């Protein structure tokens, strides 16, 4: 049975719009895969994740450094994104101390979204059996990545509206538990 992808998104409180953008981006993927999204400050969830995403803005906040340490210690794949902004001295030091990461710079939220989606697609293409990616979905992902690399369409940047929190994105047909029903569903089972 396919496994839901467990992703941990580590970011300072000031990066809430960026974190929200990443959560929304997962729902855009053209594949039928379930996602479990955990986020700062849930340090205990880092060892259970399959993938660790780090977003660095102007400053670094606790416990982001500890979360990164746990991700490295438990050998998680790390996706690192750094906003193209001036950083505080602490933010500069954190970036320098972690220069070994494959940092992807982004200038705005649409650029972050594109970089993140490319990385997620590549991750899924490396592990198709584990996450239940079919041959057709793999080809669709390759086409999706090609579109991302060609287009640089802008998305409106706004304030966070709540989609950046932790959550679960269910894959219809793959994540349905027998006898389960939606909250608020009044039909009898």
Regions found by a protein language model. Give the residues of each.
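Cross-kingdom TIR/SEFIR domain
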Residues: 20-32, 41-126
